[in-house]
Amino acid sequence: HGQSKDAFAKTKLGAWEYDIVGPWYKCNMTDVHAAIGLGQMKRYDRILARRKEIIGIYSDAFTDLPVKVLSHYTKEYSASGHLYIMRLFDKDNVAVDTKVRNEFITKMAELGVATNVHYKPLPMHTGYKKLGFDIKNYPNAYEQFKNEVTLPLHTRLNDEDVEYVIWAVKKTASEILM
């Protein structure tokens, strides 16, 4: 994607921020990656089931918080559940700004929970700014971005990890959002 950071650099706690410096292509699957992917297909149903389980646990735990979560499963659709996207609001149900959102991310990192933002709108990246794009022309994209946080959601999370993430979210929300 022409990103300024590779995936490994973005795994450092609280270091979600990156820039897209040009509208380039991302293509990094090798034959080895494809072979690994084929092997993963054998456990794909288990992966989806575990993700769905974690999503349900998270969503049940956050009903009393000033957050809104992306719906993964309805009668009309179901998602792969690879991201748990949460939008942050204050006690008056007003969407928080990026400063508050980033403070939330930092406090979560201090508690040992790596969160992320999916995704920074393209007009905010250098490569697209150079092409004349301006985020002011995309107010809906900015509104979705400004208060969005993505929680850990992967099949290597055990139940204790999930409960710890919930505890950290509740603690951080009580300090910052309420």
Indicate where each model-derived feature is located:
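PLP-dependent aminotransferase class I/II
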Residues: 1-178
